[in-house]
């Protein structure tokens, strides 16, 4: 039975017997029940199951009650606690001091009882002890009999819960490297300490020859293979063959060992085998392959591909694209953050984005900044709308989740990206129809294969994400909220064909105005690597909250100050230079799972 990470709800009160405690019991419990209902009705785990909370059986008026509740929570995979109170309580006697939980307190903003006073006292206690805790306090005074949760409080509770559940879902899971370093890309040279210390994850290594072994020995479900291949033939239409008419060098011609008309058969096997490597598949045990049936306990992974694989075998573009999509030949299903070129840091960027949204992460090269002047010079036309200040060309070398087509529709008929459990058959078919599969350019991919080719055809709010590693500092996070752009078709065609017309394209315009985001050029210039991952929605504030839980400082973002939500201890390092305070507190606290 699957054990989900949960949030413990702790109602705390003034413990004085003889009228005080008795007058607070009902209100405190109502607050706790309301918080539990809000979280469980709003948030979902990556598999679509509603998030679960555990409500304490009693209110907490002192250390005796706190100890009983701690015992109740033991063994239930409580990753975080939310303490709620309408009144003064006894500071350190009622606080959650478990070193293994992420903490928040919601203090009721009312006049009859000083919930805000306890909140401040508890935050002072946490700061003295060097324990980060999130402070939740409503903007407006409420009446004592008002049992609603104000909107601003709801937003903070949900941001805290989203981040905490993301932390819990990563803990103990694996990132599976299939292959090793790709083309000298530093992000594909995995840093095991980063995964262990900051994410609580294991790192698994699987040589790419394992795929060939399983193909040769037929270590895969033959029924699943037939289903996948038939689905591909029915739904994955082929696009252009960029190799037609070329006089290719002999070294290219003799490098392709899988005949072109057998590419899809090889690719279908590759896709199901890589999925089996990451996850459990009991069908393999039925076939006698019990060790392989157990999988690698994965939550994310990546495939090296270039060049030791792609120089002679069909590339991994289909596998990479379909793993990260919200569907495959079995219909809608949970996405997997799966990185091209095994860029582990972009794989983590994908993972953070998809855990916060439950939507497909789109892997891209942060390829080119196109200024309005350059576009006018090259195309004779001007950029307009969201694109008017210039655009960044997000384009991957053949593999991006098909949700990036923006062909799915919301209830009002608008193009969007969805969680897998909201994807309809019409949505799936629309994404497939908006994608064609172009034969790989043999000059770059001698072994052939097919690239997912589409363009994002909707103006959607998105957030571009990148985790970087800096020697002496450690991991850092970059965030750019903005919009995908629909540009003039003539402009698109000219710009797209200057790069590679067989690859998936998204035109991105970041929101400008914040420091580091003075111009679109500045964003491109500040970006820390050649790759980025974007997800649907403006989730920069949630990413900042999650990063603070993991103790990863944010070096670039365009989230307005009023949306930033970090533990109260961060304000202890200053309220003017927030970036400096972020670095200082993350350094002081150290990684979440520091040894």
UniProtKB/Swiss-Prot annotation:
Cellular location(s): Cytoplasm
Pathway annotation from the record: Carbohydrate degradation; L-fucose degradation; L-lactaldehyde and glycerone phosphate from L-fucose: step 1/3
Enzyme category, top tier: isomerase
Keywords, in A-Z order: Carbohydrate metabolism, Cytoplasm, Fucose metabolism, Isomerase, Manganese, Metal-binding
UniProt-listed Enzyme Commission number(s): 5.3.1.25
Binding-site list for Mn(2+): 341, 365, 531
Any Gene Ontology biological process: D-arabinose catabolic process
GO molecular function: arabinose isomerase activity; L-fucose isomerase activity; manganese ion binding
Catalytic-site annotation from UniProt: 341, 365
Catalytic activity, as annotated: L-fucose = L-fuculose
Major localisation: cytoplasm
GO cellular component, one term: cytoplasm
InterPro entries: Fuc/Ara_isomerase_C, Fuc_iso_dom3_sf, Fuc_isomerase_C, Fucose_iso_dom1_sf, Fucose_iso_N1, Fucose_isomerase, Fucose_isomerase_dom2_sf, Fucose_isomerase_N/cen_sf
Cofactor: Mn(2+)
Matches recorded under HAMAP family: Fucose_iso
Function of the molecule: Converts the aldose L-fucose into the corresponding ketose L-fuculose.
Assigned protein family: Belongs to the L-fucose isomerase family.
UniProt protein name: L-fucose isomerase
Species of origin: Clostridium perfringens (strain 13 / Type A)
